[in-house]
Structure formats: structure tokens, C-alpha cells
A protein has these predicted regions:
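Outer-membrane beta-barrel proteins
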Residues: 1-342
């Protein structure tokens, strides 16, 4: 009897150790609110990327090595359907984990992952907008022609070395689609990028970041499947009483023959000012083109009230301007809603 109890205790210890070495986590966020103009409004998530859940896992393989995976699904709060960056539930409707789906290995030398994921420039630039890129007040530069997400990607991330971190990625030329390439500015008020994706270059990208204390600076490069190239420079500094963020992106659009069609430059500056449980946000973004009647700009202002660490109320206003701010594209937009993270 004592031997049986001892055996059970030993097995239990091994089982506990094994379970402690691996884990699977469910996380995500839900956003619902009203978005519109003075003439029209609709119910939905202003920050569409906040209506998503992630299944992630990690297993300790010993010797400082671990295996991990991420599966990320986005949905529409108003009807429960799948959602993509276009907001159209019909796009990529057969792609369950449209946002991210990859597996990888990590060690002291960094990590390498394979699957579908954000490319380095788009992975970096979202962190330098005070509005987190998605609300109507957002002054995010958007990545110009940079690949947003790529299928069949191999992605390397180095460990942090003295505050510096390098990332690089390459994807297969086949199997990419137009919806994975950026190409609009200020929600229809700016640049429109032609979708000449039939020359099938391999999407590639790299980034270099320095982060230490209040400082965060980075550079990123991207070439999409049409051969369009984008350079991005980013920076932020946390002064304590407020945080200042900036972005600058430059891109050249080439046709199949390699002749330059358009050169675009876009920059933004924004700030986050915490006042107790309230966070004030404000920013300005502007872009220029070497072609006539293509300039655009936008001013955004908003606020977020933290009910807890995971739940907040928000409201924002975005006012586009410039050459392309005509018709509905020039309407001032607003949103008001609630976000809960889990």
C-alpha cells in the first residue's frame, strides 16, 4: 500500500512538472459602439481589431528552448460574422484564423516562426499612434504600400541586445492576395494604391528597433508582392506627464515595367496625456504625393476612460482634409463605445 501511494506521488509530481512546462491561453478583446457622421451612424466595433480572440500556447523543451503557436481570429460584434481589415465579412470568409496563424521555436538566439502573420513594418508601426491605429480619430500612417500580413512566411526575431532588436521576414510569392496589402490613407481621404499584383515578387521585410527607458525608436523596410517598397521611421518618448509619438513613411509605386508612377510621403505626430483614469489623445497626420490633387491630412482627438485594467469607455473625432477630402471622404467622423479585454 505504501509503495502504491509512493508511486502515485511520484507520478503526480511528474504530471505537475509536465503541466508546468506547457500552457495554452485564450485571450482577446471585444469592442462595441456607435460610429458615424452627423448624417449617418451604425452600430459595430470602431476598433475592429479589438473584436478578436487568440489561442496561444508555449512548451518548454529544455535547454532554454521552447515551442510556441498563435491562432488569432477576428469577428464582427454586430452580427458575429468573420471580419477582415476591409470590414467586409465576405472577404476571406473561408479563412478562420485570418489575422495570425503561426508556429515557432525560441531560444537564446531569438525566435523563428512560420505561417501567416504581420510583416515587420506593419508589426512595428502600429505602436506609434496614440489611438492604437483603429479608432476614427487615428492618425496612423498606415504603412503605405507595405504588406500587412503575408501567407507562407518565415519570420526571425533576434533577442534584445543592449536595447536593440532586429526582425526579418520573407514570404512565398504565391498565395498572397490584395487584401493583405495596404493602400488607403485616412479612411478614404488620401492615397489610393493600384492593385497591380501580377508580377508576384516575394514579400520581404526587416526592422531594427531601439527601446530603453522612455525611448523607443525604430526603422522598417518592406517590399510587397507587386514590388512596391516602403521605408518607415518611428519614434516615441514617454515624458511621464505625456507621451509623444511620431511616424514617417515614404514609398515609391512601380508598375510591372519598373517605371516610377508615384512617390508618396506621409508623417504623423500624436500624444497621449493621462489624467487619473482618463487618457486624452490627439494627433495630426499629413501626406504628399508627386502627382497633383493627391495630398491629404487629418486631425484626430479623443479620450478613453479606464473603468478597470481591462474595461474602458472611449469617444473620438476624426476630421480629414486636403485635396481628396471631398464628398463623404471629407466628413468629420465620430465614435463612442466600450472595450473589454480578457
Amino acid at each position: 500500500m505504501k509503495k502504491s501511494l509512493l508511486a502515485l506521488a511520484v507520478l503526480g509530481a511528474f504530471a505537475s512538472a509536465a503541466s508546468a512546462q506547457s500552457s495554452v491561453t485564450l485571450s482577446g478583446s471585444i469592442d462595441a459602439g456607435v460610429t458615424g457622421t452627423s448624417n449617418n451612424w451604425s452600430l459595430g466595433g470602431s476598433q475592429s481589431s479589438y473584436n478578436a480572440f487568440t489561442i496561444s500556447g508555449r512548451e518548454d523543451l529544455g535547454g532554454g528552448m521552447a515551442a510556441f503557436f498563435v491562432l488569432n481570429h477576428r469577428f464582427r460584434i454586430q452580427d458575429g460574422k468573420m471580419n477582415t481589415s476591409t470590414g467586409n465579412p465576405g472577404d476571406s470568409s473561408n479563412t478562420v484564423f485570418w489575422r495570425n496563424s503561426f508556429v515557432g521555436l525560441s531560444s537564446g538566439a531569438g525566435d523563428i516562426r512560420m505561417g501567416r502573420m504581420l510583416m515587420p513594418l506593419q508589426d512595428m508601426n502600429g505602436g506609434f499612434d496614440a489611438f492604437d491605429t483603429g479608432y476614427v480619430g487615428s492618425t496612423h500612417t498606415g504603412g503605405l504600400t507595405a504588406t500587412v500580413r503575408a501567407n507562407s512566411t518565415i519570420y526571425y526575431r533576434s533577442p534584445s541586445m543592449g536595447g536593440f532588436k532586429l526582425e526579418a521576414a520573407i514570404a512565398a510569392a504565391e498565395g498572397q492576395y490584395v487584401g493583405d496589402t495596404a493602400g488607403t490613407f485616412a479612411a478614404g481621404a488620401g492615397f489610393s494604391i493600384p492593385n497591380a499584383l501580377n508580377n508576384k515578387e516575394r514579400p520581404t521585410g526587416l526592422s531594427l528597433r531601439y527601446a530603453a527607458g522612455p525611448a523607443n525608436f525604430g526603422y522598417a523596410y518592406d517590399q510587397n508582392t507587386a514590388g512596391y517598397k516602403t521605408d518607415g521611421f518611428y519614434g516615441s518618448w514617454d515624458f511621464g506627464m505625456f507621451k509623444l509619438l511620431g511616424q514617417y513613411e515614404s514609398g515609391k509605386i512601380n508598375n510591372i515595367g519598373g517605371t516610377a508612377l508615384e512617390e508618396v510621403d506621409i508623417w504623423s505626430i500624436s500624444t497621449r496625456i493621462p489624467v487619473g483614469a482618463f487618457i486624452l489623445k490627439a494627433g495630426y497626420v499629413a501626406g504628399t504625393s508627386n502627382l497633383p490633387n493627391k495630398d491629404a491630412n487629418k486631425f484626430g482627438i479623443g479620450g478613453e476612460y479606464l473603468l478597470s485594467k481591462r474595461t474602458s469607455l472611449y469617444s473620438n473625432v476624426g476630421a480629414p482634409g486636403g485635396d481628396r477630402a471631398t464628398g463623404t471622404a471629407g466628413d468629420t467622423k465620430f465614435d463612442i463605445g466600450i472595450t473589454h479585454k480578457f
